[in-house]
């Protein structure tokens, strides 16, 4: 990420602020509705609208992204444990990270329309692609 990208990501995530868990849950719900095959990784979850389990996992997603934003210069170090978990224990198909990234971008665009400029969109897309790359790096 360029310095400008890092600035855009930090500024956008700063505006997310206290809504991070809410937006994380909304992005998950959006992903489940738009890409139903992603539900197969959550057979034990109540996937209905407003589910406590979806909200809880959305909070985990948001916390991981907050950690990533705080460690933009060392994403592999910051996300190593999550990479191990998703590659070795959960065995999530890597394409699902792209689907969640897309759902997150749509969610952020809907909540931050005035701030979601083309430059911010591009920077967030690069950031989420980097996060996805790190999370799938231990699959090899």
UniProtKB/Swiss-Prot annotation:
Pfam families given in the database record: Globin (PF00042)
One GO MF term: organic acid binding
Residues found modified as Phosphotyrosine: 23
Domain Globin: 1-140
Record-level GO BP terms: hydrogen peroxide catabolic process
InterPro entries in the cross-refs: Globin, Globin-like_sf, Globin/Proto, Hemoglobin_a-typ, Hemoglobin_oxygen_transport, Hemoglobin_pi
Tissues/organs with expression: Red blood cells.
Keyword Transport: yes
Residues with the N6-acetyllysine modification: 15
CDD domains: Hb-alpha-like
Residues that, per the record, bind heme b: 86
In-chain residues carrying the UniProt-annotated modification Phosphoserine: 2, 34, 48, 101, 123, 137
Phosphothreonine sites (modified residues): 107, 133, 136
S-S pairs: none
GO cellular component: blood microparticle; haptoglobin-hemoglobin complex; hemoglobin complex
Superkingdom as given in the UniProt entry: Eukaryota
Residue numbers binding O2: 57
In-chain residues carrying the UniProt-annotated modification N6-succinyllysine: 6, 10, 15, 39
UniProt keyword list: Acetylation, Heme, Iron, Metal-binding, Oxygen transport, Phosphoprotein, Transport
Function per UniProt: Involved in oxygen transport from the lung to the various peripheral tissues.
Subunit note: Heterotetramer of two alpha chains and two beta chains.
Similarity comment text for this entry: Belongs to the globin family.
The protein, known as: Hemoglobin subunit alpha
Organism listed in the record: Tragelaphus strepsiceros (Greater kudu)
Lineage: Eukaryota, Metazoa, Chordata, Craniata, Vertebrata
Gene behind this protein: HBA
């Amino acid at each position: 990420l360029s310095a400008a990208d890092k600035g855009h990501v930090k500024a956008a995530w700063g505006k997310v602020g206290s809504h991070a868990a809410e937006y994380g849950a909304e992005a998950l719900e959006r992903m489940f509705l738009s890409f139903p095959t992603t539900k197969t990784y959550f057979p034990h979850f109540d996937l209905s609208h407003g589910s406590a389990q979806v909200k809880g996992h959305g909070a985990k997603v948001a916390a991981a992204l907050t950690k990533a934003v705080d460690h933009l210069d060392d994403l592999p170090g910051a996300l190593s444990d999550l990479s191990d978990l998703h590659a070795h224990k959960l065995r999530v198909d890597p394409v699902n990270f792209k689907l969640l990234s897309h759902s997150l971008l749509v969610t952020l665009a809907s909540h931050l329309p005035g701030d979601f400029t083309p430059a911010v969109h591009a920077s967030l897309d690069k950031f989420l692609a980097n996060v996805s790359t790190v999370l799938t790096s231990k699959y090899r």
